[in-house]
Structures are given as C-alpha cells and as structure tokens.
C-alpha cells in the first residue's frame, strides 16, 4: 500500500444516528442517519415526521429543511457562505427507493432547496433544474423565499475580499483527526438517509457549497451517484468533503455497489477511498472525503480520508 493510500484511511466518527434497530436484525422501526453533529437535530425532525406516518422521503426532507433554516450553519441553507461574487447559491438532491430522483443546482433566494429538489422529482419530467430555471420553477411552485447572504455570511465574504485569495476549501468537520466534532464550524454538506417502517429507503443532500467558490461551481451534493445514491435492494450512501474528488469516483454509487458485491459498509468505504487515493495520488494528499453508507437492514458505517494519519 502506498504512503498516500495508507495516510488516507481510517474510520470517521461524525455520524448522527436515530433508530431503535440492532445492526444484526431486520428493520423493525424507522431508521435515520445523517452527517455531523448537527445531524442529530435533523434526525429528530425526521423521526417526528415518521410519528405522523411519514415516509422515508418525508423524513429526509424534514431533516434537511431544519438545517437549511439554521442561520448559524455556514455551509447549508440561509446561513451559507456566498460565492466569490457575494451570491449564495444552493444545491440539493433527493432520491427515493424506486429510483425517482430530483435535484437543483445554483439555486438562489429560495429557503428550502431540498423541497424544490423533491418537487422537481414529483412535478416535472426532469431530474435536475439549474440556475435561473430552478429559481423560476421554485417561485412558480410558491416556495418560500429568503434573503441571502445572512449578515454574518456577508461580513465573512467582505473580510475575504480584503485579500480575495482564491483557495476555497470545504468546511470540513476537522483539520486534525483527533479533534472531536461539535463546534458550529465543524461541518459541511448534510447528507441524510432513512428507512421507513415499510422498509423502503430514501436520501437527500443539501448544501451551499464551498465558501467563496467560483460562480457556477457545483460539487457532488446534488449529483446522484456522487453525493447520494439509494438502492432498496442493497442500501444507500451519502458523501461529504471535497466534492470534486467525490465526483471523480462516483463515490456514493461506488460505495453502494461495493456493498452489493459483498463488502461490509466499512470495507466499502475503505475500497472507494483507496481507489481515489490510487487514482489521484498526491493531488488528494491534503483533501478530505467522507462516506456514510447504510444497508437496507439498518446497519452502517462511516469512513473518511484525511491528510493526517492516526498514530499506529
């Protein structure tokens, strides 16, 4: 194993889980998982929807909406940092158990892109709308608007303008692998996976993308197969980190397919991260990518790459 690959591998702790299911038994209750510490709030919203007889798709949408509404979250929704031109552009996608998908990219002025993505899936013959077309569709469907950037996000952008150094980095959960997650800045994209009481799965991703990105940049989050993939026969996966790297290996799809081939969720994460490290070598030595798979029986794992290797 090369040094780049060796340094890339270890399990990540940042998984928020809400369930009452053993990892070794068939699903008996609804399950919901999402990324990072703030995912606990999303999970609580999803489980509340489930109590009202909501589906897995209802659960992940509800969880995503809660995070999109948080003005203190700088990488999702109304609190998201703007691009280099000072404009907040939002990306989201949803995928249902039967292969139905919907996505929006570079959406502006709309409070809940995850709900717009669902509407694209359910109310149009298309799978993705972008830019002004996505915004026009959202307004036609009477989705709630929002003023963005927030005052704090605009202040951060104006501070960035003083140097305008174009080196956007993901709002990744940790720079040092030993740092425990928990601070409000220790996060990025939220990915959500759920299993309803009917046993069917669904997933969602929502993000404002890289802070101070080039205008028009889209990462992995709204791309089905990269930031999210759901297959009722096997399981589902979501991703976070440097989106360009996730897209290069169709990361979430690759993780699910590795599980289909017999790997455990942990082994599946490892195999895709190893593949990325072999493919890109030193180009990804300072990058972070993370995957969160969940099998259709409810058991899952989390794995990520990191530029810092844990001690032997």
Each language-model region and where it sits:
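Generic hydrophobic alpha-helical segments
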Residues: 16-17, 70
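C-terminal segment of classical bacterial N-terminal signal peptides
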Residues: 19-22
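N-terminal secretory signal peptides and thylakoid transit peptides that target proteins
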Residues: 1-16
């Amino acid at each position: 194993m090369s040094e780049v690959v060796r340094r890339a591998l270890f399990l990540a702790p940042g998984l928020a889980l809400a369930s009452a299911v053993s990892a070794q038994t068939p699903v008996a209750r609804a399950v919901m998982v999402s990324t990072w510490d703030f995912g606990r709030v999303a999970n609580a919203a999803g489980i509340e929807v489930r109590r009202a007889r909501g589906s897995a798709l209802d659960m992940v949408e509800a969880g995503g909406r809660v995070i999109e509404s948080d003005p203190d979250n700088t990488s999702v929704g109304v609190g998201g940092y703007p691009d280099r031109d000072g404009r907040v552009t939002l990306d989201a996608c949803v995928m249902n158990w039967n292969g139905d998908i919907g996505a929006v990219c570079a959406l502006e002025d709309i409070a809940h892109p995850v709900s717009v993505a669902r509407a694209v899936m359910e109310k149009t013959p298309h799978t993705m709308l972008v830019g002004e077309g996505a915004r026009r569709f959202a307004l036609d469907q009477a989705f709630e608007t929002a003023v963005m950037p927030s005052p704090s996000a605009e202040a951060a952008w104006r501070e960035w303008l003083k140097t305008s150094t174009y080196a956007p980095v993901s709002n990744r959960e940790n720079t040092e692998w030993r740092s425990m997650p928990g601070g409000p800045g220790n996060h990025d994209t939220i990915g959500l996976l759920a299993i309803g009481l009917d046993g069917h799965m669904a997933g969602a991703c929502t993000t404002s993308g890289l802070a101070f990105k080039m205008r028009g940049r889209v990462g992995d989050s709204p791309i089905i197969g990269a930031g999210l993939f759901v297959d009722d026969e096997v399981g589902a996966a979501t991703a976070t980190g440097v989106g360009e790297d996730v897209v290069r290996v169709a990361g979430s799809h690759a993780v699910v397919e590795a599980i289909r081939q017999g790997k455990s969720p942990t082994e599946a994460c490892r195999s895709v991260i190893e593949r990325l490290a072999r493919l890109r070598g030193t180009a990804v030595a300072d990058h972070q990518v993370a995957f969160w798979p969940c099998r259709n029986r409810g058991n899952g794992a989390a794995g990520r790459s990191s530029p810092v290797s844990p001690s032997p």
